[in-house]
Amino acid sequence: VIFALVLGNASPVQSVAITATAVATAIGAASQIISAGTSLASTILSGLAASGYRVTCAIQVENWTRYPLIYATVQINRNAAVTVSPSSILPGKREGFSVRMPNGLAEGVYGTVSWELLGIKRRFVLMWSAPFNFNHFSNWMGVGLTRPGITKVPSGMTWFNKMYYDKTGRVGNLHFERGEFYYETNPVIYRDSKFEIEGTMTNIHNA
């Protein structure tokens, strides 16, 4: 399971580390403000995941900004499947979607999902990798934003390859932070002068 929070008006000079406990506290407080959107109105996040598959991934995003997140775009590995499609996320709402491994193949599921911030001309991008074999691979997740004015989604797995393989996340049109979720599940946090994105991922196959 992946949880991501998109917040507005964060300050890059706030250098105090945000711990998993602090994030949990913030999520608890936000539960009084953030409400379920259409996709989660009648189910919990884990209820979106496909049953009968070794590797699935259910993703929830909470929009703490005043900007609607629109034009959701998913790009995943070949033969994997989107079992519940992502939707637009209004301010003050949380929405979820799910993906699964390819049918009949010993492969995991990986890719990116992104939304445009209405009126800002930027895209919020979330990358995940949920492997089939934990002997050689781990769960990974990354979160970031495109530079102002960049809303076009590149073809194929361009953003996934950048967020999974690049050693630095502060060059080019997409800036991001990423983390490995194996021994620990501490949150990944991306900040710039306007926004802050926090995300965490479980370290199991049904992520």
From Swiss-Prot:
Tissue expression remark: Expressed by the venom duct.
GO BP terms, alphabetized: killing of cells of another organism; monoatomic ion transport
Compartments, as annotated in UniProt: Secreted; Nematocyst; Target cell membrane
Record: residues binding phosphocholine: G111, S129, P131, Y164, Y165
GO cellular component, one term: extracellular region
Entry keyword Metal-binding: no
Entry keyword set: Cytolysis, Ion transport, Membrane, Nematocyst, Secreted, Signal, Target cell membrane, Target membrane, Toxin, Transmembrane, Transport
Ranges where the record places region N-terminal region: 35-54
Major localization class: secreted
MF-aspect GO terms: toxin activity
Family matches, as InterPro entries: Actinoporin_PFT, Cytolysin/lectin
Signal peptide: 1-11
Family under the similarity heading: Belongs to the actinoporin family. Conoidea subfamily.
Protein's job: Pore-forming protein that forms pores of around 1 nm and causes cardiac stimulation and cytolysis.
Assembly description: Octamer or nonamer in membranes. Monomer in the soluble state.
Protein name per the record: Tereporin-Ts1
Natural source organism: Terebra subulata
Lineage: Eukaryota, Metazoa, Spiralia, Lophotrochozoa, Mollusca
